[in-house]
Amino acid sequence: MKLQLMICLVLLPCFFCEPDEICRARMTHKEFNYKSNVCNGCGDQVAACEAECFRNDVYTACHEAQKG
């Protein structure tokens, strides 16, 4: 269970406005549905997965802001 949580937290560097494609590549081992922007779960660490979804919204918005 601790290992799953650690894996969930691997995404943290994406918070710092990395390009979208890098974040997506970093997330390929996760159960995250980008097309619908929905977390399908991260093992039994649902809260951690929901936090990832929130961070995804934040860095996607940041990336969009960088384009402008």
Curated annotation (Swiss-Prot):
Is exclusively composed of 4 tightly packed alpha helices (no beta strand is present). One of its GO terms (molecular function) is toxin activity. Expressed by the venom gland. It comes from the Eukaryota. Arose via modification of ancestral neuropeptide hormones (ion transport peptide/crustacean hyperglycemic hormones (ITP/CHH)). Keywords: Amidation, Disulfide bond, Secreted, Signal, Toxin. The lineage of its organism: Eukaryota, Metazoa, Ecdysozoa, Arthropoda, Chelicerata. Residues 1-17 form the signal peptide. Toxin that paralyzes insects. May have a direct effect on the insect central nervous system. This is U1-agatoxin-Ta1a. Gene3D superfamilies: 1.10.2010.20. The modification Lysine amide is found at residue 67. Belongs to the helical arthropod-neuropeptide-derived (HAND) family. Disulfide bonds join 23-53, 39-49, 42-62.
